[in-house]
Swiss-Prot record:
Keyword Transmembrane helix: yes
One protein family per Pfam: Cytochrome_B
GO molecular function, one term: metal ion binding
Protein name: Cytochrome b
Cofactor comment text: Binds 2 heme b groups non-covalently.
Length: 379
């Protein structure tokens, strides 16, 4: 009797990707974040779809439509907060996923790594545009401040900003186009995720040792299916606890005030997951320099595979690199804290030191440490 799972053209693809996929036998819980990101994307698309059914992308009614969703729509409040906090969970998983890739040397899968960076940029763009939609104070001023950064581009900057705004300020045209892009981007992200997985399955997964695991593989199902299921339950429990007990913990109180172009909030700041990049942007007094530093802080990830001079792939057996890695994590936490502080001393100085440290660790200390470790191991 033929097995449909292995014969049917569609079932065969699913079978090779999630059931009979040969996976390394020693991958840890750090490898769970890929499937958790898939779950987050699914939650965001489903909740977003239901929100879009009731939301209006007009400056006069956008804020009221969000209030209407929370007050009048059946379980509207839970859908809204699942979507808002789902974005936070998405970024927590994203940062953990990228961190694992850095630690265990997964960036040597160049195609997978590069499409991953493209995915990160797409998710960041989607989250930024989504934050503008409720049309609160922080939505409006965040949109104004961040889109205004493009005016730093020489010659064509100011024209480009007005083109994005669809006028001479952030207004109805801006809100409408942001809603359109925010709606379509998750589907583009889904397509990119499929390409990401396609490239990953060309090489197979990495593992904590960084060594080839062809001699010791196990089927994805049932072993990693059950393992992913545990991660999934933990993530959903965390998300629902956040939504039920403190839904506004990660939000900004200013966004409960309708957008007012005549009144600037005392501190314009983005959501917590952008604060590290925002701190790097603010730490440079020059506008164009700040924009370049902001872009570099993300795009520097693309350089990492080319700066990897170590003979060992993973950091598992490289204590000096491990110390640097955790210094980088601490530095990013400091930058996140600084991004949420007002622009005054000592925060300005701390932000500048942390920004320099960030680039110094990645561009100089890490390659040097890799070479030193090779020497110590007489390689």
């Amino acid at each position: 009797m033929t097995n449909t799972r292995k014969q049917h053209p569609l079932a065969k693809i699913i079978n090779h990707s999630f059931i009979d996929l040969p996976a390394p036998s020693n991958i840890t819980a750090w490898w769970n974040f890929g499937s958790l990101l898939g779950l987050c994307l699914t939650v965001q698309i489903i909740t977003g779809l239901f929100l879009a059914m009731h939301y209006t992308s007009d400056t006069t009614t956008a804020f009221s439509s969000v209030t209407h969703i929370c007050r009048d729509v059946n379980y509207g409040w839970i859908i809204r907060y699942l979507h808002a906090n789902g974005a936070s969970m998405f970024f927590m998983c994203l940062f953990a996923h990228i961190g694992r890739g850095l630690y265990y040397g997964s960036f040597t899968f160049l195609e997978t790594w590069n499409i991953g960076i493209a995915l990160l940029l797409a998710v960041m763009a989607t989250a930024f545009m989504g934050y503008v939609l409720p049309w609160g104070q922080m939505s409006f001023w965040g949109a104004t401040a961040i889109t205004n950064l493009l005016s730093a581009i020489p010659y064509m900057g100011p024209t480009l900003v007005e083109w994005i705004w669809g006028g001479f300020s952030v207004d109805k045209a801006t809100l409408t186009r942001f809603f359109a892009f925010h709606f379509i981007l998750p589907f583009i992200i889904t397509a990119m995720v499929m390409i990401h997985l396609l490239f990953l399955h060309e090489t197979g997964s990495n593992n904590p040792s960084g060594l080839p695991s062809d001699s010791d593989k196990i089927p994805f199902h049932p072993y990693y299916m059950i393992k992913d299921l545990l991660g999934l339950i933990i993530l959903l429990l965390t998300l629902f606890s956040l939504v039920m007990f403190s839904p506004d913990l990660l939000g900004d109180p200013d966004n409960y005030t309708p957008a007012n172009p005549l009144n600037t909030p005392p501190h314009i700041k983005p959501e917590w997951y952008f604060l590290f990049a925002y701190a790097i942007l603010r730490s440079i007094p020059n506008k164009l320099g700040g924009v370049l530093a902001l872009l570099s802080s993300i795009l520097i990830l693309a350089l990492i595979p080319f700066m990897h001079t170590a003979k060992q792939r993973s950091m598992m057996f490289r204590p000096l690199s491990q110390c640097l890695y955790w210094m980088l994590v601490a530095d990013l936490l400091i930058l996140t804290w600084i991004g949420g502080q007002p622009v005054e001393n000592p925060f300005i100085m701390i932000g500048q030191v942390a920004s320099i440290t960030y680039f110094f660790i990645i561009l100089i200390l890490m390659p040097l440490t890799n070479t030193l470790e090779n020497k110590l191991l007489k390689w």
